[in-house]
Amino acid sequence: SGHSHYALTGSFFNPGPYAGYLAMILPICLYHYLRVPEKWRYLCKSLKIEKITATVAGMLILCVLPSTMSRSAWIAAAISCIWVAYMHRDKRKWNILWRRYKKRYILWGAGIFLILLLAAAGMFFLKPDSALGRLFMWKMTCRAIAAHPWGCHTGFACAYGGAQSLYFASGNYAAWEERVAGSPEYAFNEYLEFALTYGIVMCILALFVIFGCLWIGVRLRRYGVCGALISLLVFSFSSYPLHLPAFIVAGICLLLACGIGDVIGKYLILCVCLVVWLGGYTEKWTQEKDACRDWMNARILYRSGAYEAANRAYEKLYPSLRNKGTFLFEYGHSLHKSGRYDESFECLDRARLYSNDP
């Protein structure tokens, strides 16, 4: 575990992203299991190893996923695996069975639908305030999008905070909305957050590219990769995977593997990878990770009242963490306690752009 409050986080800081990453791998395991239809004794050694590896990895993921308590990951894994299994169906056999047992399948379908409804209700009541909180965040994000249809240059936090403050100032809100309201860093819906940050038009264009890659992948029968991408798309509907470098890299690789990489050419992909590497994005992510670790040490000084020492530590971290609202609030408050009021005001004023915490 990478967090003292959670028993299971993998290499992440929270069980949610860890579960989402596992849910993205599960359909690939299922694909490699299903893609070899021959009987076991007729398989060559390499295919046997592939099938065993996919089976073991898939079973281990199925053992871990429930313990993460991530409903978003459960849904993403279920939808993507059902899609992969459906794409491997024998169409001729399915048509014969449908004509022969049509009424029975309709009854089974109705029963499965009722079970899914009960499962959805169970997942809601598992953590009801969490589910209501996300619904409220989506509502506020939609109101912010209506106010900024072409995107908000100040970022998600500033636009969300403004929309939420106006909503509560009107007085027309429910008691549960007041209870679950907070100051989130993310919208827990990558589509809404992207539309708010970059505009509705850019969001539609991005979705057009993604579904174009999926279409190419399906035409090329790359169902495992497409299933993983579908899992990521479903998980993005109620979480924040694109704020984590691991998901960004995985998402780009999946888009290229769907077939767009064959279309645009391997040399162009190599050039893009070199640009990303030369641009220092990997180094930037590493520096930010190290800065966050040092921030935890500086926070000890801040909370113990050693503000001068904390200021020196915060000053070194400022170039790497100047876009994090919580860090700016702490730094500004520490400067205020040290009597450096002008610097404190500048720091807190900048924090308003990156945090909606009142």
Regions found by a protein language model. Name each.
Residues S1-Y6, G10-N95, W108-A121, L196-V225, ...:
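Alpha-helical transmembrane segments of multi-pass inner-membrane proteins
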Residues G2-Y6, R143, T154-L196:
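Interfacial juxtamembrane loops and adjacent helix segments
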Residues A121-L135, L274-S304:
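Hydrophobic alpha-helical transmembrane segments in integral membrane proteins
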Residues A291, G325-T326, P358:
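Helix-start (N-cap) detector for alpha-helical repeat units in TPR-like alpha-solenoids
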